[in-house]
């Protein structure tokens, strides 16, 4: 309906998410962290092919909300995820928070990651209000879908599973209380 809106999103996705200065895998983890936090099933059930090709595994997505306590994430990933967490949940950011980020990222990387998280969060909240489901748009396409969501039938089965990440009775959409590991 509004071509400029489409192109704004498409250009941001290409220039900031796909390309950009920060590690793509880190941006992908932050994107899914936001999805899990705001319960955007549309975005949370997609995966970056580029991130998968560079080593991100499906297990890396499984418990992002509890990233601080998990050994699967390195200190750089945890720092970036803490940035996504602070933006998503409006957490206070003190000097120690910024020192942690600056230990792992340049100023341009921090700007890009912060911008990407902010854009992602707004876009995901908007998509959630539209209640758009995969396979309603571009039916028959399976590109970038998470395992178990490649077809309309698979999506329905996965969403019925007891351990589906976006079930309303899960603890996914709860403001985190974790603190950075010492």
Where are these regions (language model features)?
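Hydrophobic alpha-helical segments
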Residues: 1-182
């Amino acid at each position: 309906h509004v071509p400029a809106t489409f192109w704004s999103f498409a250009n941001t996705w290409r220039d900031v998410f796909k390309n950009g200065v920060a590690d793509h895998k880190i941006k992908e983890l932050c994107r899914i962290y936001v999805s899990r936090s705001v319960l955007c099933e549309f975005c949370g059930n997609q995966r970056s092919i580029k991130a998968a090709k560079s080593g991100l595994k499906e297990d890396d997505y499984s418990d992002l909300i509890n990233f601080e306590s998990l050994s699967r994430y390195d200190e750089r990933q945890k720092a970036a995820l803490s940035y996504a967490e602070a933006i998503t949940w409006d957490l206070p950011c003190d000097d120690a928070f910024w020192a942690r980020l600056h230990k792992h990222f340049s100023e341009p990387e921090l700007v890009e990651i912060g911008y990407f998280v902010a854009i992602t969060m707004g876009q995901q909240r908007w998509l959630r209000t539209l209640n758009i489901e995969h396979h309603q748009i571009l039916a028959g396409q399976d590109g970038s879908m998470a395992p178990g969501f490649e077809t309309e039938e698979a999506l329905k089965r996965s969403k019925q599973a007891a351990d589906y990440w976006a079930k309303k009775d899960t603890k996914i959409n709860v403001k985190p209380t974790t603190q950075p590991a010492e």
